[in-house]
Amino acid sequence: MASEPRGSRKVKIGVVVSAKMEKTVVVRVERIFSHPQYLKVVRSSKKYYAHTELKVSEGDKVKIQETRPLSKLKRWRVIEHVGVVS
């Protein structure tokens, strides 16, 4: 079984859609792919709950990294503030 080496974690870039909780933000990650049969370009998005110590607000672009379970919903951590989406 060819698995990833220990310590490598998934990293995603998304937009903060909610920053109303303490030390928790909701990040929407958008994925663009071509439909396998119809070949139409499809957009889909998924929301992730992420732990943050940084000061981020709604509309900010952030980089999140997979981590151990921190609560019932939080499995991601904000590692970098990339910019602001206009």
UniProtKB/Swiss-Prot annotation:
Pfam families: Ribosomal_S17. GO terms for molecular function: rRNA binding; structural constituent of ribosome. Signal peptide: none annotated. InterPro entries: NA-bd_OB-fold (IPR012340), Ribosomal_uS17 (IPR000266), Ribosomal_uS17_bact/chlr (IPR019984), Ribosomal_uS17_CS (IPR019979). Keywords: Ribonucleoprotein, Ribosomal protein, RNA-binding, rRNA-binding. One of its GO terms (cellular component) is cytosolic small ribosomal subunit. Gene3D superfamilies: Nucleic acid-binding proteins (2.40.50.140). One of its GO terms (biological process) is translation. HAMAP family: Ribosomal_uS17_B. Part of the 30S ribosomal subunit. Belongs to the universal ribosomal protein uS17 family. One of the primary rRNA binding proteins, it binds specifically to the 5'-end of 16S ribosomal RNA. This is Small ribosomal subunit protein uS17. It comes from Chlamydia pneumoniae. The lineage of its organism: Bacteria, Pseudomonadati, Chlamydiota, Chlamydiia, Chlamydiales. The gene is rpsQ.
